[in-house]
């Protein structure tokens, strides 16, 4: 039987963000990098471990080797171009704008300088919520929660001196960075 491959329409939108590079399915990337995978083998990505938002259409976080403690490709599906986004990590999880604001405007903010994902989020927050820098979104946070998500990626399970983040908003990967 022929292998079913999901097709992509990469001509719809020009990609200029951190996910502009297209790589082959199964590629391991350096820490903090994100790329697109458009040659997806149907149904063979791995196990869905999380969805954001939890209801309706959204992004699915897929672990290519669930149960492994080593680094491996992860995939995020749900983009209009039908290409998954991939990165390499030992552990990955979604984080909401509410969680980001608790970390960014609370005590941890005194330790970590502003990163590319923080700066990109400030721009989104200002346009959606009207909130100034270093101030939480407020009552309009639920609007951000519908189409904005962070992904935190860790090189190993346990203590990590550094980690990476990706910010997705309204179907676009806006920023990716490495902290620590």
Task: Tell where the protein language model's regions lie, with residue ranges.
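Compositionally biased P/S/T/G-rich terminal and signal peptide-adjacent segments
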Residues: 2-13, 40-42, 47-80
